[in-house]
Amino acid sequence: MTILNHTLGFPRVGLRRELKKAQESYWAGNSTREELLAVGRELRARHWDQQKQAGIDLLPVGDFAWYDHVLTTSLLLGNVPARHQNKDGSVDIDTLFRIGRGRAPTGEPAAAAEMTKWFNTNYHYMVPEFVKGQQFKLTWTQLLDEVDEALALGHKVKPVLLGPITWLWLGKVKGEQFDRLSLLNDILPVYQQVLAELAKRGIEWVQIDEPALVLELPQAWLDAYKPAYDALQGQVKLLLTTYFEGVTPNLDTITALPVQGLHVDLVHGKDDVVELHKRLPSDWLLSAGLINGRNVWRADLTEKYVQIKDIVGKRDLWVASSCSLLHSPIDLSVETRLDAEVKSWFAFALQKCHELALLCDALNSGDTAALAEWSAPIQARRHSTRVHNPAVEKRLAAITAQDSQRANVYEVRAEAQRARFKLPAWPTTTIGSFPQTTEIRTLRLDFKKGNLDANNYRTGIAEHIRQAIVEQERLGLDVLVHGEAERNDMVEYFGEHLDGFVFTQNGWVQSYGSRCVKPPIVIGDVSRPAPITVEWAKYAQSMTDKPVKGMLTGPVTILCWSFPREDVSRETIAKQIALALRDEVADLEAAGIGIIQIDEPALREGLPLRRSDWDAYLQWGVEAFRINAAVAKDDTQIHTHMCYCEFNDIMDSIAALDADVITIETSRSDMELLESFEEFDYPNEIGPGVYDIHSPNVPSVEWIEALLKKAAKRIPAERLWVNPDCGLKTRGWPETRAALANMVQAAQNLRRG
């Protein structure tokens, strides 16, 4: 029984983000469709070859996407919203781009499909839309074309296909409501056709992804698996693939399916390998997801060997990445600025392929010497002074319940704040950032590259902050911000100023479409060596009599948008960050900053996949925020900002944050989000976003007034603030001025009654 290795998918964007550049060039009309397609072909060929050279036995095909793999699956099934269709009913790459971004070089612009987080990762997918009575047919043959491409290059391939039930689960019904699961029988013939085409090409195994099987699915959805897979069996061998959590709770459903193998995530799941082996049919192949596909740490291969060795020789076995390597940067070898010790702790996608090859060789031969050699740096890390800071660990251990409590309840604080700030009814503010103009980005880049000295850089930033204050005073806003000209990214900026973080040069991962992010890496205990935001906040406040908000990114968001350590809990990391930022709150307060905003946009997206695990996460997530904020005096007003569309199920936790003011994204939902705050009888102040900053459209005074009146029907007017949905970083100044002027005017009209 020879053990093979495989990956579940590989990063698409290219080492130098070639895909991003090709997409954006094509969208801008600067290159042809054929030039774009050629870049895709070149990247796929390179990535297959790189995986093969690293020792991967079975190469994934179908993991490449022009925008997103869920959207690719939608097109494969002929699921194109009416507003995005070509007049002749054909489907081409521009159809795909119209769904993803609302427009393409050809065809009529139309509202893009909704985008949301892929399970609990920082990748986003395009939500499939379902309407009653829609038809499905094979219309987009990208998967088959790419299989032909890989076979022509002589590769041993394993096509990757998103499974039918997970695809339906991820979608939403539009218009007249019906049960989307009722579409299952309509899409299965298309899946059968695709599998038949793959069988014709001599394909032995197909990886069929059903990550929905790690969720707490309703019984009707679990019951749908057996008839669905009865319909799909028989043409090729199916590797039922799950990830991001364990499968034990749904194992009875899984073991009844007519598939030939199962992939499990043994990194993020709590499944016991020996127990799985006992419960799976004896003729099934088990694909063990042992190498973490969504973090950057080198694996302790000796540990992985021990984890799996008891079932070697007892059943067909493959070793694999836990999930697609899509969530990992591509290649560590091009990182030239990391010091040797820290670099030796990491493994990016290509290094993870090498880890799989080493592990596979050792399991086949029984010789573990190479595993011990590979694992030595990560074992040595456990004792590194770069990792452990006794002062931080001591401070964390000394936290008491008192450290997460403000001195007084909201009602007492609100009175002190009213006396201090004397704000009018319907107070106006913005969320934090102002347009990041070319001048600002050039200034930061020149400084980073060493083309500009520190004095000239600081003079330039100071001028942009001064302009932001002047603009806001001219517009008549009540609570101002400094505009964040000095910040490249709301997480990276703080990571750069905290001990315990490192940064890469090319550690890009895809967020959605052409957007890539370069997350910081938490390598050790987190502390704050010096104040971070105080100087610029103090400078901005010195130029106006109106209050200027201090702006911090909250501990849970910094954690969720970074690559975390694996040797301590996420709770520990979040609380260490909270303690560091608690000192920042105290310093801002001492510098005369009376309103401090702590953004937590990621609080909800950090939720575990299983509801049964939510309470524990929310408990420490809320506690981290409160540790961060609780040092503030009664007359210091703490704001928080959150931007997502679902509050109902976590309202208790939102209230437990005990922020004096929460600003939220509500304009796109026409204030419907406020329903949860009304039903909960949310006690503190709320700023429902009155216009969508993701659109260049300027809202009218009347439109904003109408939204605010609607809000006042749900929340008492004396507790309402007036603000945009989100930061204004991505907007231009002309539309920003126009929109804010209308927003201020609407507030003034309401004050006059």
Curated annotation (Swiss-Prot):
Its EC number is 2.1.1.14. Keywords: Amino-acid biosynthesis, Metal-binding, Methionine biosynthesis, Methyltransferase, Repeat, Transferase, Zinc. Pathway: Amino-acid biosynthesis; L-methionine biosynthesis via de novo pathway; L-methionine from L-homocysteine (MetE route): step 1/1. Pfam families: Meth_synt_1, Meth_synt_2. The keyword Repeat applies. It comes from the Bacteria. Binds 1 zinc ion per subunit. Belongs to the vitamin-B12 independent methionine synthase family. This is 5-methyltetrahydropteroyltriglutamate--homocysteine methyltransferase. The gene is metE.
